[in-house]
Amino acid sequence: MNATAIIAASGIGKRMKLANGGCKQMLEIGGFSVIYHTLKAFEQAPSIHNIYLATRAESIPLIQELAASANIGKLTAVVEGGKERQDSINNCIKAIEVKRHQSGVTPDVILVHDGARPFIQPEEIEEIARLSLLFGACVPATRPKDTIKFIGHDPEFFGETLDRNRLVQVQTPQGFRSELLMQAHQQAEAEGWYSTDDAALVERFFPQQLIKIFEMGYHNIKITTPEDILVAEAIYQQLQAHGNATSEAASAS
């Protein structure tokens, strides 16, 4: 399979409360930056042939240097992000289209991922890519742990309680057959219609397209607030311990 990854890493992380508009993707977990962990996972996924990353203009040299030092050979382009996340993804799609015209090769699927989700695993990337090609679209999600309620007509009071059994919390990478995602972004740009994730674009412009749910564990968190760093360090240690245990078991067998 020929899969392409788009990584959105343009956010300034207001909720992270970083000084001087710092970039949350450059925060360290386990001695390595968040974006390093993210890039490494896609580098190690066999189906991923090319990676496109959108970031702030001033961060482009830093990302390129990091990728070179970490041997991220699949990083095809680092492009300037847009005003909104959707604009950043669209900038990457346009770069993919340029490469397609030059090479004559269209990726089978495109996976769109948040740069601030450092714990996606290569085997999960592979499965999402496979399901995206099979069904046309696939989005990872987790079951909510908390009860979720609507806000009432008076915003200071609750409305109805939602059935938790019919709810999921959506994550990334979200995978789509290439033409589906490209056309959804083209139509959204033409209409000036914005959403917070790519699945919503497909739902709007291709309502007949079913989106496969890929249920995930709770490790694939998005680094958003200062508290997430503490949680991320614990997840990193757990993943490291599991990896070492797996390696030792394989050596003993």
From Swiss-Prot:
The keyword Glycoprotein does not apply. Signal peptide: none annotated. Pathway: Isoprenoid biosynthesis; isopentenyl diphosphate biosynthesis via DXP pathway; isopentenyl diphosphate from 1-deoxy-D-xylulose 5-phosphate: step 2/6. The record marks R15, K24 as: Transition state stabilizer. PROSITE patterns: ISPD. It catalyses: 2-C-methyl-D-erythritol 4-phosphate + CTP + H(+) = 4-CDP-2-C-methyl-D-erythritol + diphosphate. Keywords: Isoprene biosynthesis, Nucleotidyltransferase, Transferase. The keyword Nucleotidyltransferase applies. One of its GO terms (biological process) is isopentenyl diphosphate biosynthetic process, methylerythritol 4-phosphate pathway. The record marks R164, K222 as: Positions MEP for the nucleophilic attack. Belongs to the IspD/TarI cytidylyltransferase family. IspD subfamily. Catalyzes the formation of 4-diphosphocytidyl-2-C-methyl-D-erythritol from CTP and 2-C-methyl-D-erythritol 4-phosphate (MEP). This is 2-C-methyl-D-erythritol 4-phosphate cytidylyltransferase. The gene is ispD.
